[in-house]
Amino acid sequence: IPRDQIWVTSKMWLQDYKYEDAKKAIETSLNKLGLDYIDLYLLHQPYGAVDEAWKAVEEAQKAGKLRSIGISNMTPKLWNKFVPNFDVTPAVNQVEFNPYFQQKELREILAKDDVRLEAWAPLGQGNADLLHEPAITAIAEKYGKNAGQVILRFENQEEIVVFPKSVHEARIKSNLDIF
């Protein structure tokens, strides 16, 4: 598979947020992956030396090592604390998102900065209540889909970046068949 047809996301862990450690962490990620660049690189949590880590990812992006840079788990309060001090606005904020947890306040803030919300747990971490929600199952039955497909379609229509995970081939195919 050609490299330009594969999207690679990696994260920097909290213990690497000091500036010099952050620079090393980026290089370590590139080396372990055997890549010249990473498509999206995220800070895993908005705690600790966020400003130092962000400076390192901004520099790595300028150097062409990181195509896009973002943050994970940043609440509205933390977004407003950190992002105004960044030179480069994050392209992505990866947070929990599903029909039970729609992050409306955060989405409004991100929209103002033209930032994409990327959902982890887009299917509610397998929450049986969500997958058996009567409104969702009724829509699924009406359109000949399963509850997971309805949820992923909803999130796609809301312009949420989703990446449901599965090791089951049938489920992976089902997750792609949402249109």
Please provide the spans of the model-predicted regions.
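N-terminal binding-site loop/beta-alpha segment at the start of enzyme catalytic domains
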Residues: 1-6, 123
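Short loop/turn motifs at secondary-structure junctions
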Residues: 2, 34-37, 65, 89
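Structural motif corresponding to the early beta-alpha repeats
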Residues: 7-20, 42-45
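Short, acidic/polar
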Residues: 17-33, 52, 77-80, 101-103
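CE4/NodB-like, metal-dependent polysaccharide N-deacetylase domain
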Residues: 22-42, 59-63
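Beta/alpha (TIM)-barrel catalytic core signal, keyed to glycine-rich beta->alpha loops juxtaposed to Asp/Glu
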Residues: 45-179
